[in-house]
Amino acid sequence: MSFVPVAEDSDFPIHNLPYGVFSTRGNPRPRIGVAIGDQILDLSVIKHLFTGPILSGHQDVFNKPTLNSFMGLGQAAWKEARAFLQNLLSASQARLRDDVELRQRAFTSQASATMYLPATIGDYTDFYSSRHHATNVGVMFRGKENALMPNWLHLPVGYHGRASSVVVSGTPIRRPLGQMRPDDSKPPVYGACKLLDFELEMAFFVGPGNKLGEPIPISKAHEHIFGMVLMNDWSARDIQKWEYVPLGPFLGKSFGTTISPWVVPMDALMPFAVSNPEQDPKPLPYLCHDQPYTFDINLSVALKGEGMSQAATICRSNFKYMYWTMLQQLTHHSVNGCNLQPGDLLASGTISGPEPESFGCMLELSWKGTRAVELGNGQTRKFLLDGDEVIMTGHCQGDGYRIGFGQCAGKVLPALSFA
């Protein structure tokens, strides 16, 4: 229990302590903080208190404007920081609790803070690791007999996304322009995307990287995973459909990707690890692991259109539905010798479950635009309209507490005029 008041339904109890980057009106410099209740603990103010065997020589990482340097220190440093912070914030520890002047400088309300991307993202990779999602999309476009491509059950399929257009929650997303071919009997056209979609995803930040040419073995993969965020992989389905053969997604994805600002450390999630999915056929040996690394994370997506007084929940899913684990994703990414770096972002792909209400995108929820998704008050959607706000949330439910991620939200702006 912490001396900082924390509501029972708060995403950020002392069991969580996610890391983020924030600024305030009084101090516009972006800096590292930890969320506790509705407060932010400014680690740049208390960096001198990190006197453990590792962090005593690296206190300056908490004075940086991003988490990259801290991520790069590795698992032992993360564990040292977490243990220290949980002790410092506990109700029985007087060091910060009873120092009124330090508390006034160290704590900021989340409501008064501006949040930033938690790290400088050098590279971003998006996987395609939900069997339910891959099957549904395959059925739509190739038929039931050819739903999964021949490689899908043998490796975690992925593509390299655009790191420069990853934005923090609350950043508006402009409806993209591009080339489409809505009528297969006619030439392609240029214009504003008409089939704009969201994708419910999660992503993890890489900690220490690997040298070029030296793969990360799956037995060591967990040492390279810093923590997780929510992600909305915004998608222009009509642009994507026309462009993706033969090299995969390009402009249909690269216009915007939203992540939540707080990075939940893996140690906060480990109590919610569940058995890995059964994989048949068994993967090749380099992808096999026994360590449970699938997590029971409740996820939901709400949509609020213009004129709606409150958002309507249109999807409830769970991260435990993923077929390929993060350990497998990271190991496969590096198996050819590709070098990962601190702050790299690796995403899950759309998280869909077995039931229609757990489908993680409008493409599935509307089944390729053939079904209307009810929002209430007579409003429906097949794809996203201008002014729609998509709000993603997620949490693990503990006994009397929850480990949450905050929000991953973004509002659709109209496309720019085009010639």
Curated annotation (Swiss-Prot):
The active site is at residue 133. One of its GO terms (molecular function) is metal ion binding. GO terms for biological process: homogentisate catabolic process; L-phenylalanine catabolic process; lipid metabolic process; tyrosine catabolic process. Its EC number is 3.7.1.2. The modification Phosphoserine is found at residues 92, 309, 417. Homodimer. This is Fumarylacetoacetase. It comes from Bos taurus.
